[in-house]
Amino acid sequence: MAHESVWFSHPRNFGKGSRQCRVCSSHSGLIRKYDLNICRQCFRERASDIGFNKFR
């Protein structure tokens, strides 16, 4: 059994490893609310393009 076939052999159907940012493919800091699935860094860059407004 080669190393490549063992490395990602565990199914990732749930948990943090199953979800990633749709922009940069990062697993950390995901915003899942409203089915955004964008990490917080990418959200700050693209929030106004998506339609979010900052009140303050």
Curated annotation (Swiss-Prot):
Which residues belong to the signal peptide in this entry? none
Keyword Disulfide bond in the entry? The reply is: no
Q: Which key words are in the record?
A: Metal-binding, Ribonucleoprotein, Ribosomal protein, Zinc
The molecular function GO annotations come to:
structural constituent of ribosome; zinc ion binding
Gene that specifies this protein:
RPS29
Which metal ions or organic cofactors does this protein require, according to UniProt? Zn(2+)
Q: This protein is called what?
A: Small ribosomal subunit protein uS14
Q: Where does Zn(2+) bind?
A: C21, C24, C39, C42
Family recorded in the similarity comment: Belongs to the universal ribosomal protein uS14 family.
Per the record, the domain of life is Eukaryota
Q: Which terms under GO biological process does the entry name? A: cytoplasmic translation
Keyword Cytoplasm belongs to the record:
no
Q: How is the cofactor bound?
A: Binds 1 zinc ion per subunit.
Query: What Gene Ontology cellular-component terms does the record carry?
Result: cytosolic small ribosomal subunit
